[in-house]
């Protein structure tokens, strides 16, 4: 299954929740707030979702939020399931460790989709080595920096001026002057987005 490439606002409407897939535009121009119902014809009262339907909706919401294909998402579930501990928490921690997500958390992109493009275009170094794989899993102690040649571009010049307002999670640190971040520690269950119920994903894939 390929990555979703249609109107991302439809994903929010299908999930029944605001997923912030378009970054700042989700604050100023949110289609979901105007049209929260699912896309398509509205025929009478909405049907009540079955347990399986609720599990699917939650799984899709998490997958869309992190911008992953079904195959990629299923692989991450398999990695989480092979680890000791709570599978749902393991999976969310792995998702948070993705390089594109770390850039998003640091404020280098207003959305995970934008952060993914930054990685794929070769602007990012991890411990001094160019890394252009968005799904790369960061490790404790690693440093994420912007290439010196990239800092001269208009995007990163603007970013350096505006990044002050971004709140950084406790497991990361940010040097705003050098546009670099460091992984102080790996994220834990307490850092997981409270909107997501990863246990429903475990139940979905366990059937």
Swiss-Prot record:
Stored SMART domains: Ribosomal_S4, S4
UniProt-annotated stretches for the region Disordered: 35-54
A GO BP annotation: ribosomal small subunit biogenesis
Keywords: Ribonucleoprotein, Ribosomal protein, RNA-binding, rRNA-binding
Domain S4 RNA-binding: 97-163
Cellular component, GO annotation: small ribosomal subunit
Any one GO molecular-function label of the UniProt entry: structural constituent of ribosome
Entry keyword rRNA-binding: yes
InterPro entries cross-referenced by the UniProt entry: Ribosomal_uS4 (IPR022801), Ribosomal_uS4_bac-type (IPR005709), Ribosomal_uS4_CS (IPR018079), Ribosomal_uS4_N (IPR001912), S4_RNA-bd (IPR002942), S4_RNA-bd_sf (IPR036986)
Ribonucleoprotein is among the record's keywords: yes
Assembly notes: Part of the 30S ribosomal subunit. Contacts protein S5. The interaction surface between S4 and S5 is involved in control of translational fidelity.
Function: One of the primary rRNA binding proteins, it binds directly to 16S rRNA where it nucleates assembly of the body of the 30S subunit. With S5 and S12 plays an important role in translational accuracy.
Name assigned to this protein: Small ribosomal subunit protein uS4
Native organism: Dehalococcoides mccartyi (strain CBDB1)
Name of encoding gene: rpsD
């Amino acid at each position: 299954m390929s990555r979703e490439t249609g109107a991302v606002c439809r994903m929010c409407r299908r999930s029944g929740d605001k997923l912030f897939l378009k970054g700042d535009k989700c604050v100023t121009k949110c289609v979901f707030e105007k049209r929260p119902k699912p896309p398509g014809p509205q025929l009478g009262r909405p049907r009540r979702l079955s347990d399986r339907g609720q599990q699917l909706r939650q799984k899709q919401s998490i997958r869309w939020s992190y911008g992953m294909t079904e195959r990629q998402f299923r692989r991450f579930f398999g990695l989480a399931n092979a680890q000791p501990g709570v599978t749902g928490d393991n999976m969310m921690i792995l998702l948070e460790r993705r390089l594109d997500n770390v850039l998003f958390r640091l404020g280098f992109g207003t959305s995970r989709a934008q952060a993914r493009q930054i990685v794929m275009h070769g602007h990012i170094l991890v411990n001094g080595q160019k890394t252009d794989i968005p799904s790369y899993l960061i490790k404790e102690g690693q440093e994420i920096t912007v290439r010196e040649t990239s800092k001269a571009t208009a995007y990163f010049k603007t970013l350096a001026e505006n990044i002050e307002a971004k709140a950084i999670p406790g497991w990361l640190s940010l040097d705003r002057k050098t546009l670099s971040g460091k992984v102080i520690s790996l994220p834990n269950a307490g850092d997981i987005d409270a909107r997501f119920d990863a246990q429903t994903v475990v139940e979905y894939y366990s059937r």
